[in-house]
C-alpha cells in the first residue's frame, strides 16, 4: 500500500496505518544503525523546530533536541514559564505565529485537544510529545524495542500492560498492539480500565490487522505467556498527591514484582517502563510515599529487584525514544 508521510502530523497512532507505523519503526532502526556506524547523513539542514513543553521532561526534550541536532536542524525550547502560551496568548494564535517561523512544532502538555488545535492552525507538521490521552512517540520507541528484543515479527509478539489502564501509556499501548497485529493485554482494575469506546475501536483495528485484544481485571491473566510486561507510574504528572491514597490499594495487585514476572511463565520475558520509575525510595516522591506505605519502600509500580534485573529493558526504551523521534522528523520534514 502506497503512503506519504511528508508534512504529516503525529498526533496519535490512530491517524497512522499499520504500514506507516512499521515504516517509521524500520526507518528508526536504519537511522540508529547509521548513528552507531558513523555514517548518518544530515537530512534536516536549514530546518527549524519549536519545542513547546507545558509539562516537565527529561527523555522527550533530550530525544527531540539530539535527534534534530544529529540531522542538522535547529530547535527552540519553549518551557512552561518561558512564553505567553495559554496566559497572554491562545494556542490558536500561538500556532499561527510559530507556523510562520518554524518548519515543525513539538508539543508536550495536558489535553489532546490542545495539540490537535495546534495542528489545525499551525500550517506545519505538529508532533505530540505527550498528552494526558496519548503518547505516540513513546509507542514508536516501544515498538522498536520490542522488535529488537523479541527477534520475531510483530504479529507473533504478545505483551501486557499492567496498572492504570486509563492513562496515556495504557491507552496508547492498546492502540499500538491493535494496529500492529499484536496480542495485547491490558491488566487493570475495573475502575481504571480504558474507556469502552477506545477498546471497541482497538478491537476493530485488531480484527483488520490480525491482532488480539484482552482487557482483564487480573494481572496474572494479562501476563500469561507474554514476551513483554509494561507498566507506568500510578499517579501521573498533574494529578493531586491525594491520588496516591486511592491508587495504592487498588493497584498493588498490579505491581510488577518477582511473583508477577514468574506468573508470565516465560523465562525470557522482558519488563518495560517509559520512565521515570519509582522502583525504590531514592527519589523525593518515592521517599514520601514510603513514609505512608512502608511496603512500597522497595518499589511502587515495579520493585527494585525486577527493575535492576536483566529482564528490565527500560533504558533501551529510553535510548530508542531518540531514534524513533528522529525517524518521525525525517519522514515528515526531510
UniProtKB/Swiss-Prot annotation:
Q: Which Pfam families match?
A: OTCace, OTCace_N
Main location as per UniProt: cytoplasm
Recorded catalytic activity of this chain's protein: carbamoyl phosphate + L-ornithine = L-citrulline + phosphate + H(+)
Q: From which domain of life does this come?
A: Bacteria
Q: What keywords are annotated for this sequence in UniProt?
A: Amino-acid biosynthesis, Arginine biosynthesis, Cytoplasm, Transferase
Q: Does the keyword Glycosyltransferase apply?
A: no
Q: Which GO terms describe its biological process?
A: arginine biosynthetic process via ornithine; citrulline biosynthetic process; L-arginine biosynthetic process
Q: What class of enzyme is it?
A: transferase
The UniProt record lists the keyword Transferase: yes
For this UniProt entry, the molecular function terms from Gene Ontology, in alphabetical order, are: amino acid binding; ornithine carbamoyltransferase activity
Q: Which InterPro entries match?
A: Asp/Orn_carbamoyltranf_P-bd, Asp/Orn_carbamoylTrfase, Asp/Orn_carbamoylTrfase_sf, Asp_carbamoyltransf_Asp/Orn-bd, Orn/put_carbamltrans, OTCase_ArgI
Q: In which pathway does it act?
A: Amino-acid biosynthesis; L-arginine biosynthesis; L-arginine from L-ornithine and carbamoyl phosphate: step 1/3
Q: Which SUPFAM superfamilies match?
A: Aspartate/ornithine carbamoyltransferase
Concerning PROSITE patterns, the annotation shows:
CARBAMOYLTRANSFERASE
Which residues bind carbamoyl phosphate per the record?
A: 57-60, 108, 135-138, 274-275, 321
One GO cellular component this record assigns the protein to is: cytoplasm
Per the record, the similarity remark reads:
Belongs to the aspartate/ornithine carbamoyltransferase superfamily. OTCase family.
User: What does the function comment of this entry state?
Assistant: Reversibly catalyzes the transfer of the carbamoyl group from carbamoyl phosphate (CP) to the N(epsilon) atom of ornithine (ORN) to produce L-citrulline.
- Protein name in the entry: Ornithine carbamoyltransferase
What is the source species? Cutibacterium acnes (strain DSM 16379 / KPA171202) (Propionibacterium acnes)
Give the encoding gene's name.
argF
Amino acid at each position: 500500500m502506497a503512503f506519504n508521510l511528508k508534512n504529516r502530523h503525529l498526533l496519535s497512532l490512530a491517524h497512522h496505518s499499520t504500514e506507516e507505523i512499521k515504516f517509521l519503526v524500520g526507518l528508526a532502526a536504519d537511522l540508529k544503525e547509521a548513528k552507531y556506524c558513523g555514517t548518518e547523513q544530515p537530512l534536516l539542514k536549514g530546518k527549524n523546530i519549536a519545542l513547546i513543553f507545558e509539562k516537565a521532561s527529561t527523555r522527550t526534550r533530550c530525544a527531540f533536541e539530539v535527534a534534530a541536532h544529529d540531522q542538522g536542524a535547529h530547535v527552540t525550547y519553549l518551557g512552561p514559564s518561558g512564553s505567553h502560551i495559554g496566559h497572554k496568548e491562545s494556542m490558536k494564535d500561538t500556532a499561527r505565529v510559530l507556523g510562520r517561523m518554524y518548519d515543525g512544532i513539538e508539543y508536550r502538555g495536558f489535553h489532546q485537544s490542545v495539540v490537535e488545535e495546534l495542528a489545525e492552525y499551525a500550517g506545519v507538521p505538529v508532533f505530540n510529545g505527550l498528552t494526558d490521552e496519548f503518547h505516540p512517540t513513546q509507542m514508536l520507541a516501544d515498538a522498536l524495542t520490542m522488535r529488537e528484543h523479541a527477534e520475531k515479527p510483530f504479529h507473533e509478539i504478545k505483551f501486557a500492560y499492567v496498572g492504570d489502564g486509563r492513562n496515556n501509556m495504557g491507552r496508547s499501548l492498546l492502540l499500538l498492539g491493535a494496529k500492529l497485529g499484536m496480542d495485547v493485554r491490558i491488566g487493570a482494575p475495573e475502575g481504571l480500565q480504558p474507556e469502552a469506546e477506545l477498546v471497541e475501536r482497538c478491537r476493530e483495528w485488531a480484527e483488520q490487522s490480525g491482532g488480539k485484544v484482552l482487557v482483564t481485571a487480573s494481572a496474572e491473566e494479562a501476563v500469561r505467556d507474554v514476551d513483554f510486561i509494561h507498566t507506568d507510574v500510578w499517579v501521573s504528572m498533574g494529578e493531586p498527591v491525594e491520588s496516591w491514597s486511592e491508587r495504592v490499594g487498588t493497584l498493588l495487585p498490579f505491581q510488577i514484582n518477582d511473583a508477577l514476572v514468574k506468573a508470565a511463565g516465560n523465562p525470557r520475558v522482558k519488563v518495560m517502563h517509559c520512565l521515570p520509575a519509582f522502583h525504590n525510595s531514592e527519589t523525593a516522591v518515592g521517599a514520601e510515599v514510603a513514609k505512608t506505605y512502608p511496603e512500597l519502600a522497595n518499589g511502587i509500580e515495579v520493585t527494585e529487584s525486577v527493575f535492576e534485573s536483566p529482564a528490565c529493558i527500560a533504558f533501551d526504551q529510553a535510548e530508542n525514544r531518540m531514534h524513533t523521534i528522529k525517524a518521525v522528523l525525517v519522514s515528515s520534514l526531510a
